[in-house]
């Protein structure tokens, strides 16, 4: 590769020259009349034709003279033939000088990669065995003014791929497939829950009190009402209000917003599934989650073995179940139960492990900090981590045998949290006390502590049946199923820092 090819300034000058030339070609099309026609109606998709006629020989296609009408973007232009791409795949189109008019042939010579064309003709097969359309008519539908990345330079800069996802989707089939899988996953989750009598609902994105999770919200202002509002961090409290109201099985797939850091696992705007079912507990949700994840793996991969990086996660085997307390001891044999139950020792262990200890944390909070620093990243195969301390679970029901912990689990796969669930707290007085404790933590400096939600307490006072709820991060789940290393790879338009 020459220095000129590597020189960004030279590349930019070359691109500007190509854009100028394409604009001249567009001007010529405008002079002919409508340069952006919208009267063509496609009748066939590229991939459908490839599959339907895969077993037809050259002679059989010639005899059948199957008429087709296709449209797509030019991805390769060799003069005598072009390759076009639509939403399903690609097919060759042949420029037949015997069947196309001189005017059409002259126009074809001016077309560039990236242009969108409509082609009519009959199916044929080349000597090499490739299916193609022998065109009897072809015309330009959209002139592309910017050249696509070529095979030498490509679109390899990761940040540019995220910023210009529209180009990324054009040139990278694996990226298109990732987002097809994402759509399949969401559609299957919806079907899975509806078959089990769950009702899909929508709850507010703008909230006066951000609740349902421990996170920092985005703040905004409602001008007409002159009031501070927040983008929701979770829909939980509204979904549980619906359970109070009699919708005993509900779910929502929608966006949450958290004003926190950006990483390969975190995006400020992300998609979450939350579902709630009355007359169930958190162990029922574990069983349901295992069933759902196995179905999704089978749907996407045709197997319950999920490859991710250099590892393989086994969804076909029962997911491990281990308490927070026991997991710390299992993965850190140098620690003892006495160490974890002594608040001074636990504080020292958390600090040594790298946790941000502020000084007001109770024993349960410190134990969770230790878990996050010393255990979480070691949970490669699917693990349900259970019995979270009640002080970090302000919305979860206390365990009957040990009131210091709750009937809660988080699902970890590949060292990442994928789901969070619990038997819901439906004792209104207990909930009010826990909200007050959260307010005290917030006053002490915990930015992620919850606000007091008086209306939610009032809803519980009307009576909520025993209920289990769960949230599953759609983005992280799709990362696993598509072997994607970054959350930005599975979000169409991830948030990016402004360009300089």
Swiss-Prot record:
Main location: cytoplasm
InterPro entries named among the record's database cross-references: Aa-tRNA-synt_II, aa-tRNA-synth_II, aa-tRNA-synth_II/BPL/LPL, Lys-tRNA-ligase_II, Lys-tRNA-ligase_II_N, Lys-tRNA-synth_II_C, NA-bd_OB-fold, NA-bd_OB_tRNA
Required cofactor names: Mg(2+)
Cofactor notes: Binds 3 Mg(2+) ions per subunit.
Pfam families named among the record's database cross-references: tRNA-synt_2, tRNA_anti-codon
Residue ranges of the TM segments: none
PROSITE patterns membership: AA_TRNA_LIGASE_II
Catalytic activity: tRNA(Lys) + L-lysine + ATP = L-lysyl-tRNA(Lys) + AMP + diphosphate
Keywords associated with the record: Aminoacyl-tRNA synthetase, ATP-binding, Cytoplasm, Ligase, Magnesium, Metal-binding, Nucleotide-binding, Protein biosynthesis
GO MF: ATP binding; lysine-tRNA ligase activity; magnesium ion binding; tRNA binding
GO annotation (BP), single: lysyl-tRNA aminoacylation
Binding site for Mg(2+) 1: 410, 417
Subcellular location(s) of the protein: Cytoplasm
EC number: 6.1.1.6
Superkingdom of source: Bacteria
CDD domains xrefs: LysRS_core (cd00775), LysRS_N (cd04322)
Gene Ontology cellular component list: cytosol
Residues binding Mg(2+) 2: 417
NCBIfam families membership: lysS_bact, PRK00484.1
Similarity comment: Belongs to the class-II aminoacyl-tRNA synthetase family.
Subunit structure: Homodimer.
Protein name: Lysine--tRNA ligase
Gene coding for it: lysS
């Amino acid at each position: 590769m020459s220095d000129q090819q590597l020189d960004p300034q030279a590349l930019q000058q070359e691109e500007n020259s190509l854009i100028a030339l394409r604009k001249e070609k567009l001007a010529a099309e405008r002079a002919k009349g409508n340069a952006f026609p919208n009267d063509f109606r496609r009748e066939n998709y590229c991939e459908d034709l490839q599959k339907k006629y895969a077993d037809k020989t050259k002679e059989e296609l010639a005899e059948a003279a199957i008429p087709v009408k296709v449209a797509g973007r030019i991805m390769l232009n060799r003069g005598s033939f072009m390759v076009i791409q639509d939403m399903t795949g690609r097919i060759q189109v042949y420029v037949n000088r015997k069947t196309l008019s001189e005017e059409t042939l002259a126009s074809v010579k001016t077309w560039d990669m990236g242009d969108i064309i409509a082609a009519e003709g009959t199916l044929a097969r080349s000597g090499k065995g490739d299916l193609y359309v022998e065109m009897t008519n072809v015309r330009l539908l959209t002139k592309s003014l910017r050249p696509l990345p070529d095979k030498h330079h490509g679109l390899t800069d990761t940040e540019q791929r995220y910023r210009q996802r529209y180009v990324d989707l054009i040139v990278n089939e694996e990226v298109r497939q990732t987002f097809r899988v994402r759509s399949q996953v969401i559609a299957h989750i919806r079907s899975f829950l509806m078959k089990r009598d769950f009702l899909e609902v929508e709850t507010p994105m703008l909230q006066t009190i951000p609740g349902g999770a421990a996170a920092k919200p985005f703040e905004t202002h409602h001008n007409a009402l002159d009031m501070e509002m927040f983008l929701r961090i979770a829909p939980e409290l509204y979904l549980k209000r619906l359970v109070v109201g009699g919708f005993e099985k509900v779910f929502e797939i929608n966006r949450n917003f958290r004003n926190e850091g950006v990483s390969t696992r975190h995006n400020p705007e992300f998609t979450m599934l939350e579902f709630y079912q009355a007359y169930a507990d958190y162990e029922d949700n574990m069983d349901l989650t295992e069933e759902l994840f196995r179905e999704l793996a089978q749907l996407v991969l045709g197997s319950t073995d999920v490859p991710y990086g250099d590892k393989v996660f086994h969804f076909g085997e029962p997911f491990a179940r281990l308490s927070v307390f026991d997991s710390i001891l299992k993965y850190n044999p140098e620690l003892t139960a006495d160490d974890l139950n002594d608040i001074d020792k636990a504080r020292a262990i958390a600090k040594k492990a790298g946790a941000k200890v502020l000084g007001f944390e109770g024993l349960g909070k410190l134990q969770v900090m230790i878990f996050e620093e010393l255990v979480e990243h070691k949970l490669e195969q699917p693990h349900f981590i259970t019995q979270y301390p009640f002080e970090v679970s302000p919305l979860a029901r206390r365990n009957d045998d040990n009131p210091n912990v709750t009937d809660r689990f988080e699902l970890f796969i590949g060292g990442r949290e994928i789901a969070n669930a619990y038997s819901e707290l439906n004792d209104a007085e207990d909930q009010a006390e826990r909200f007050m404790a959260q307010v005290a933590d917030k006053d002490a400096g915990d930015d992620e502590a919850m606000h007091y939600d008086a209306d939610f307490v009032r809803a519980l006072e009307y009576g909520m049946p025993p209920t289990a709820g769960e949230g599953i991060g759609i983005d992280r789940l799709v990362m696993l199923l598509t072997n994607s290393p970054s959350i930005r790879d599975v979000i169409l338009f991830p948030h990016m820092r402004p360009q300089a």
